[in-house]
Amino acid sequence: MIDKSGETQAAVRIGVDIGGTKIAAGIVADSDPTTVIEYRRRPTPTTNVIDEVAGIIQELIDASPVAVSTIGIGAPGVIDPIAGEVVSSGPTMQGWAGTKIADTLRGQFPLPIAVHNDVRVMGLGESVYGAGHDFDNVLFVSLGTGVGGALVRDGELVASPHFTAGELRCLWGRLPDGSAALLESFASGPGLASCYNAHAENPAVDLHEIMSRYHAGEEYARDVIEEHLFACGVAIGGFISAIDVDAVIVGGGVGTIGDAIINPFARGVRDGAIPPINEVPVIQAQLGNHAPIVGAAYLGKTQG
């Protein structure tokens, strides 16, 4: 790739992360694939989402010192990565299902374009360049406003006939009282807050406040966090026993809080998995807030 000065430069790629509340995108160079060298962020509009995405992509193309080689996109919902289309979606983005992301953007940008689910893309980046880079078979677990996941084998997302491989939010776990519940209802940020407030003398506004109480030594906060993350880990331990992986990487806003989350989760994984997979490493994600963009850029490089 040659820049305007005539010197050869590493290829650059655009990674886009479409979310329910924001669209983030950036330029990533092959020479330094974990660094975002140009960054844009916009609120997600209620309509014409792809028009907003196209505008951001054009801004990045204009800002790039060399020609952009590929575009990779992570988007919410079940995504058909072959067609680059939204197969189904939740209530966060009304009317999103059926959106032909790749075809629409190819009409404006004559570049290779790849699209996949946003959490899968984040897990891909983390598996290739982050905490999972030493492992061939990775389960990425995202604990944030929801619960999601990705299965990565040999540097690629596992393909599946209905495009849901790695989806974790519909897994069930066993709560401390013996009842069963969806992981998302008790291991996501809102889920943990709901579990805490169910029996709290002084309800908390959100998980951030609960963690402040945890670190201040409140026993009830500690019990809620440890018991529910342990329960989540047990469920994931059973899941990895069925699919077999080399490592479990934990990311997302909750998953990257630190040892208070990772340690009970890892104990649960060891308790719920059968030997010898109960000894696989459980590692906190490393790439930070730009993981979705890094992963999307890599998706574009390999699948675009």
Task: Describe each region flagged by the PLM.
Residues 1-70, 80-85, 105-113, 125-137, ...:
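ATP-binding/phosphotransfer module of carbohydrate and carboxylate kinases, centering on a glycine-rich
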Residues 17, 118, 144:
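Active-site glycine-centered loops adjacent to acidic/histidine catalytic or metal-binding residues
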Residues 21-22, 144-146:
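Short, small/polar residue-rich loop motifs at catalytic or cofactor-binding pockets
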Residues 75, 143-145, 247, 252-253:
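Short secondary-structure boundary segments
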Residues 75, 153-154:
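A cytosolic small-molecule/anion-sensing beta-strand core signal
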Residues 85-97:
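A charged helix-plus-loop insertion that forms the helical arch/lid used to bind
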Residues 115-119, 123:
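Short loop/edge segments at beta-strand edges and connector loops
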Residues 164-168:
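Structural signature of FAD isoalloxazine-binding scaffolds in flavoprotein oxidoreductases
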